[in-house]
Amino acid sequence: MNQPVSASPVVSVGSVTFGQDRPLSIIAGPCQMESRAHALEVAGALKDIAARLNVGLVFKTSFDKANRTSASGARGIGLKQALPVFADIRSSLGLPVLTDVHEAAQCAEVAQVVDVLQIPAFLCRQTDLLLAAAATGKVVNVKKGQFLAPWDMGNVVAKITGGGNRNILVTERGASFGYNTLVSDMRALPILARTTGAPVIFDATHSVQQPGGKGASTGGEREFVPVLARAAVAVGVAGVFIETHPDPDHAPSDGPNMVPLREFEALVRRLMAFDALAKAADPACPE
């Protein structure tokens, strides 16, 4: 069995900390980078919300949605256009930034302007990609593949630590259940924490996806995002990943499972209350 990263890990992303016994932190932003103006608008709104709630927040968005259902699906503004936008968000807003990488050759360049490199779920076993991300020294957030058991992620994390990087987050985003459906097994959250030794993130929006559910695009059931997010926080996680958009019904990707930006603050406020209760010390209720 692979050795976990540590018994009680804390991973810092700028001023934001992720730990199983630390207050909840949030990773949030639109599915894809649609334009510089759109990214800065959403990032600015999220920064204001995080300040009001006093919650740690990492901004996320993707420069390329390489894994689209259809070849005609919008993919984002692309790597070269996105790099200066990532830099602007970090410098002008002071927010740490996360984005996903799809090829080993992208890692070093992207790492110059972001704080977290994310490994997509479908690529979580790609050894060259994991090693290239590890070599940057940046925090690596690796999503558990929909096809993997939670205990299988020990081998994935071992590849990253074997590459000399112990700054790792592990994200649960559901498991394939028949056709066009994902389910969230809440047992996976403590199993991931125990097996990998890394702080665990729950991806509340991708967990309600219906992959390929609309034929040429992915469907989703965003009404269940708060339900699953509350359940995960009650079980105990280091953070929650939430994709949000000012107008998700007209977003170029993942609209059916994104949370409307106007609903984001109330959702996070409630999750913080659940988190405080879940992590409160109570000697009468041992784990």
UniProtKB/Swiss-Prot annotation:
Assigned EC number: 2.5.1.55
Pathway involvement of the protein, from the record: Carbohydrate biosynthesis; 3-deoxy-D-manno-octulosonate biosynthesis; 3-deoxy-D-manno-octulosonate from D-ribulose 5-phosphate: step 2/3; Bacterial outer membrane biogenesis; lipopolysaccharide biosynthesis
Transferase as UniProt keyword: yes
Biological processes annotated in GO: keto-3-deoxy-D-manno-octulosonic acid biosynthetic process
Transmembrane segments: none
Enzyme superclass (EC): transferase
UniProt GO cellular component terms: cytoplasm
Molecular function GO terms recorded: 3-deoxy-8-phosphooctulonate synthase activity
Family affiliation: Belongs to the KdsA family.
NCBIfam families cross-referenced by the UniProt entry: KDO8P_synth, PRK05198.1
Protein name: 2-dehydro-3-deoxyphosphooctonate aldolase
Protein species of origin: Nitrobacter winogradskyi (strain ATCC 25391 / DSM 10237 / CIP 104748 / NCIMB 11846 / Nb-255)
Gene: kdsA
